[in-house]
Amino acid sequence: MNNKFLFLVFLSFFNFFTYANSQEQVNSASTDLENESSLPIFEEDKANFVNNDSTQPVSIFNISDLLKIVLFLLIAFFIFFLLKKLIFYSKKSKYEQNSNLIKELVFYEIDVKNSIRIINILDNVYIFLVSSNSFTLLKEIKSEEELEDLKLRLSKINDSAKKDSFQSIFKKMLLKKEEIPSSGNDYVKLEEKIEASLKDKQDRLKKF
C-alpha cells in the first residue's frame, strides 16, 4: 500500500513537471516570435533597439526556474520523509515479530541475586532459576496439556493476593498436584531447602 502511494506521488509530480516544461516551451516560442517581430529593419531602428536593450536589466535566474527549484526541494523533502517513515515502521514491525518469539511470562525475585523466570521461547515454555553467575533450567513444559495447566495457574496467581508469595509460586507452578505439601510447615521446609541450595551454590561459585 505504501509503495503504491509513493509510486502515485512520483507519477503525479512527473506529470506536473512535464506539463510545466511544455508550458515553458510554448511561452519561450511565443516570446521568440515576439522578439523576431520586433527586430529592426532599418538602420535607425537598429540603433534605437540597441539603446533599449542596453537599458534593460539582466536577470540571472528566471522566476519559473526559481519556482522549479523550490518545488524540487519540497518534493525531495516530502519523498525523504515518506521513505524515513516507511523504514521506521518496517523496523518496528520486524522488532515486534522478533519480540513475540521470546516472552517472559513470570518474573519472581527471590533475593537481590536470584530470581525465577518463566519464559516462552518459540511456543516452548521453560522455568529457569537465574542467579548472578548461573542460569539453571528447572522445568520444561513440553505437552499442550501442561502448557494450558500452566496458563491456568498463572491466571490464578495474577488474581491471587499472594502474587509475590514464595510458597504460591512453587505451589502453583513448579510442583505437581500430588507433590504439593499439605501443611504450612512443609512449605517452610521447602523454602528453607531452596534457600540453602542457593546459598550453597553461591559459596561454590565464590570458591571457584
Curated annotation (Swiss-Prot):
S-S bridge residues: none
The entry's keywords: Bacterial flagellum biogenesis
One matching Pfam family: FliO
Keyword Transport: no
Any one cellular-component term (Gene Ontology): membrane
Highest taxon of source: Bacteria
Keyword match Cell membrane: no
Position of the signal peptide: none
UniProt-listed GO biological process terms: bacterial-type flagellum organization
Function, as annotated: Required for flagella formation.
Protein name in UniProt: Flagellar protein FliZ
Species whose genome carries this gene: Borreliella burgdorferi (strain ATCC 35210 / DSM 4680 / CIP 102532 / B31)
